[in-house]
């Protein structure tokens, strides 16, 4: 049976020096109000998607050092410019020594730019879609990113959302271990049924505690690891 969030928080607090110390750790990863997320320019949404995609499998320090070159090469991640890159532009990117020359990831930026452009045409802006999406259907937002975007499945989409300030759980090794301990899932979530169970658990813990998904996710992880 899943325990109440107060018990989970107490476990994490005991490992991290008490409730005040734990709250200070959680405050290091703040979420943003929906109005602030909605005001994010869509080029920054696309840039965050690109950053997370290129970080996967590479040193984050390497990507950070190269990031100004990425911004220049992808024209500031202007969604329209990236969505409709001609073949010669793609070829130039594949030959650009200033960035990571991974063809699949470069093409993923183009595919995600098209998604951002489409969402803006449908609902005003991609950032607005993310901001308005109800936390109670967080897994639905993950599914949108996975199915309409490229390379945004797994924890990549989760990390994009958290980086944008959306309350977000991330299925890290420690967080998954806590979910298994709490009998939410039997293994790392992979199926729709698994993610529905995680969503239900987070909805319940949020209702009990008044805390958002980012704080709950980090608290769970901190009952296991650093």
Language-model features: where?
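N-terminal polyanion-binding entry modules of DNA glycosylases/AP lyases
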Residues: 1-102, 106, 219-226
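C-terminal accessory module of base-excision DNA glycosylases/AP lyases that mediates lesion recognition
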Residues: 1-32, 130-226
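Non-catalytic, well-ordered alpha-helical scaffold segments
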Residues: 43-47, 68, 103-110, 139, ...
């Amino acid at each position: 049976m899943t325990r109440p969030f107060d018990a989970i928080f107490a476990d994490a607090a005991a490992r991290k020096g008490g409730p005040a110390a734990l709250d200070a750790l959680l405050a290091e990863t703040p979420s943003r109000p929906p109005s602030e997320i909605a005001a994010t320019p869509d080029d920054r949404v696309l840039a965050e998607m690109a950053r997370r995609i290129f970080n996967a499998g590479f040193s984050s320090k390497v990507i950070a050092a190269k990031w100004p070159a990425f911004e220049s090469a992808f024209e500031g991640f202007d969604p329209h410019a990236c969505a409709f890159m001609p073949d010669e532009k793609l070829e130039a990117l594949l030959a650009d020594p200033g960035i990571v020359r991974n063809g699949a990831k470069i093409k993923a930026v183009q595919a995600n730019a098209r998604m951002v452009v489409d969402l803006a045409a449908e609902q005003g802006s991609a950032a607005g879609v993310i901001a308005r999406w109800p936390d109670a259907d967080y897994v639905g937002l993950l599914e949108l990113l996975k199915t309409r975007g490229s390379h945004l499945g797994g924890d990549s989409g989760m990390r994009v959302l958290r980086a944008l300030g959306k309350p977000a759980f991330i299925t890290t090794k420690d967080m998954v271990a806590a979910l298994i301990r709490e009998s939410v899932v039997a293994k790392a979530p992979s199926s729709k049924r698994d993610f529905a169970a995680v969503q239900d658990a987070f909805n319940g813990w949020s209702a009990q505690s008044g805390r958002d998904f980012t704080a709950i996710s980090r608290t769970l992880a901190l009952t296991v690891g650093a």
